[in-house]
UniProtKB/Swiss-Prot annotation:
This is Interferon-induced GTP-binding protein Mx1. Residues 274-277 are annotated as: G5 motif. Interferon-induced dynamin-like GTPase with antiviral activity. It comes from Ovis aries. The keyword GTP-binding applies.
Length: 654
């Protein structure tokens, strides 16, 4: 939809008669005007009202809303353009005039509506009933925020103007770009200003309005270059040429080429306006009169009159264009905004769940609250020790980590017993030489067999205890993480849970270590069921016979020179190794699972439930971290804003 000049300003000057003065024309104008306002109310106003309502809800604290940012080099005419659009005078002077971002919210009223304004900053609101007060209030607001000097601030100043003579727009006036610090300005003033500007123009929800004097080389304009950096295709950038009356004679055609988008291309193109000059301001020329003079200037200008006819010139045409651009931009960004609100709502909901519910005031309610928290914690502990807990995509369950340690233990046992035949035979020969008694050659010395077995088993005791400590640490850390997950916001409860986790760990680890060492003491009693041992021995002998057969088939085979007793001891050792390795590699993990996994978890569960017996401790246990209550309140407020915003968007007819 396209808005006309009538939506912006109703001139009462003689020039208004240029459109016809007879009664038929006036009647037609009145009818057209009524139809236009009807269309405006039906199509344009709902879009503006939607964004205004979201802004009133405070959604801007969470997400960027569609707006227009006005940028330009220092003294490019930014403030003059904003004055002409808003109908109010803004601070002027040399150096940096705009020292804080100024959010100018213009709201068009019906013809009978009265002008009103409001300045908001630093949690202050100042109602204004006279447009002449605006300049003074904005200046005082800037001093209150940025101080008396020439520094700038990121703190926003909001100016709301409601009037029948303004377009529906949201404009953000940003400080003019300066390159050299003067006077008491900070030495890095250029960097500060550019950082502030970039913060706004980076947002995809922002239309960048770049103000450039018509009498300068547009290619050298810093503001246009910054806009191009963040919007290379010019999809959301509009160029505004000012001061056309200062253009050197003979260069007018170049200005026309720029406005017609033939020099520095922008998809949204350019407009050209003529605002009040310094002399006109000193002579107190009203903004209404300035608009009339602007139109006459373009109508009478040989080169620029065509731009007026094309709708590319004057403040009213600019206001119409900006309103339409903002409406189109709102419609374009609404789906994205809706998705952002939905995603943010979901994220805040999940974050709020981490902080739980508010702590109740009633004692009975406190007990139920504590029961709920401890019960949830205990359920996850039990799920964890049973290997059924929920984990992230890149995390592993506790039992998976523990099983990995058990697999390492099995490999250690295998490696210990799978020594090479020569090494074992050498060891047997050494024992024969040292411990052989009065036996004749060929008799097996059972003592030699026992000593070798005991020696090979006992060396596994300390590795078994080391594995116990490793597994216990893994389990203790996991239980502590579960405590942090459920109790992190209640430091006394979390500290109590960690204390119990540590105490029970120490107790269960000691019990497990005693059992492990007891098991290795029992393994010093060389024993195996007869039928089991006979079966193992038979398997070893069959295997050796098969290997001997393969060796004899080899042409280069040479018989090993060994005593029959040595060979027999070797076979017995291998048979017993087979059984004892199976026993140790399985039984030690069973001991660890029983004491430092299952019993550990069950004891922790019982110990946490015992906390419910002392009602005097409820307040202490449920005491929250200092910032938790404030954080929960903050998240609830955000969630409420976003919920209401989703409702508004759902009802929007667009």
């Amino acid at each position: 939809m396209v808005l006309s000049d009538l939506d912006i300003k109703e001139p009462d000057s003689p020039e208004s008669g240029l459109n016809g003065s007879d009664d038929m024309v006036r009647e037609h104008e009145t009818e057209s005007k009524g139809n236009l306002y009807s269309q405006y109310e039906e199509k344009v106003r709902p879009c503006i009202d939607l964004i205004d309502s979201l802004r009133a809800l405070g959604v801007e604290q969470d997400l960027a809303l569609p707006a227009i940012a006005v940028i330009g080099d220092q003294s490019s005419g930014k403030s003059s353009v904003l004055e002409a659009l808003s109908g109010v005078a803004l601070p002027r002077g040399s150096g940096i005039v705009t020292r804080c971002p100024l959010v100018l919210r213009l709201k068009k009223l019906e013809k009978e509506g009265e002008w009103k304004g409001k300045v908001s900053f630093l949690d202050r609101e100042i109602e204004i009933s006279d447009a002449s007060q605006v300049e003074k209030e904005i200046s005082e607001a800037q001093i209150a925020i940025a101080g008396e000097g020439m520094g700038i601030s990121h703190e926003l100043i909001s100016l709301e103007v409601s009037s029948p003579h303004v377009p529906d727009l949201t404009l953000i006036d940003l400080p003019g770009i300066t390159r050299v610090a003067v006077g008491n300005q900070p030495h890095d003033i250029e960097y500060q200003i550019k950082s502030l500007i970039r913060k706004y123009i980076l947002r995809q929800e922002t239309i960048n309005l770049v103000v450039v004097p018509a009498n300068v080389d547009i290619a050298t304009t810093e503001a246009l270059r910054m806009a191009q950096d963040v919007d290379p295709q010019g999809d959301r950038t509009i160029g505004i040429l000012t001061k056309p009356d200062l253009v050197d004679k003979g260069t007018e055609d170049k200005v026309v080429d720029v406005v017609r988008n033939l020099v520095f291309h922008l998809k949204k193109g350019y407009m050209i306006v003529k605002c009040r000059g310094q002399q006109e301001i000193q002579h107190r020329l009203s903004l209404d009169k300035a608009l009339q003079r602007e139109r006459i200037f373009f109508e009478d200008h040989t080169h620029f009159r065509d731009l007026l006819e094309e709708g590319r010139a004057t403040i009213p045409c600019l206001a119409e264009r900006l309103t339409n651009e903002l409406i189109m931009h709102i419609c374009k960004t609404l789906p994205l905004l809706e998705n952002q609100i939905k995603e943010t709502h979901q994220r805040i909901t999940e974050e709020l769940q981490k902080y739980g519910k508010d702590i109740p005031e009633e004692e009975s309610e406190k007990m139920f609250s504590l029961i709920e928290k401890i019960d949830t914690f205990n359920k996850e502990i039990i799920s964890t020790i049973e290997g059924e807990e929920h984990v992230g995509q890149y995390d592993s369950r506790l039992f998976t980590k523990v099983r990995a340690e058990f697999c390492k233990w099995s490999a250690v046992v295998e490696k210990n017993f799978e020594k090479g035949h020569e090494a074992i035979r050498k060891e047997i020969k050494q024992f024969e030489n040292r411990y052989r008694g009065r036996e004749l050659p060929g008799f097996v010395n059972y003592k030699t067999f026992e000593i070798i077995i005991k020696k090979q088993v006992i060396v596994l005791e300390e590795p078994a205890v080391d594995m116990l400590h490793t597994v216990t640490d893994i389990i203790r850390n996991t239980f502590t993480e579960v405590s942090g997950k459920h109790f992190s916001e209640f430091f006394n409860l979390h500290r109590t849970a960690k204390s119990k986790i540590e105490d029970i760990r120490l107790e269960q680890e000691n019990e497990a270590e005693k059992s492990i060492r007891l098991h290795f003491q029992m393994e010093q009693l060389v024993y195996c069921q007869d039928q089991v041992y006979r079966r193992a021995l038979q398997q070893v002998r069959e295997k050796e016979a098969e290997e001997e057969k393969k060796k004899k088939s080899n042409h280069y085979y040479q018989s090993e020179d060994s005593e029959p007793s040595t060979a027999e001891i070797f076979q017995h050792l291998m048979a017993y190794h087979q059984e004892v390795s199976t026993r140790i590699s399985s039984h030690i993990p069973l001991i660890i699972q029983f004491f430092v996994l299952r019993t550990y978890g069950e004891q922790l569960k019982k110990s946490m439930l015992q906390l419910l017996q002392d009602k005097d401790q409820y307040d202490w246990l449920l005491k929250e971290r200092t910032d938790t209550r404030d954080k929960r309140k903050f998240l609830k407020e955000r969630l409420e804003r976003l919920s209401r915003a989703r409702q508004r968007l759902a009802k929007f007819p667009g």
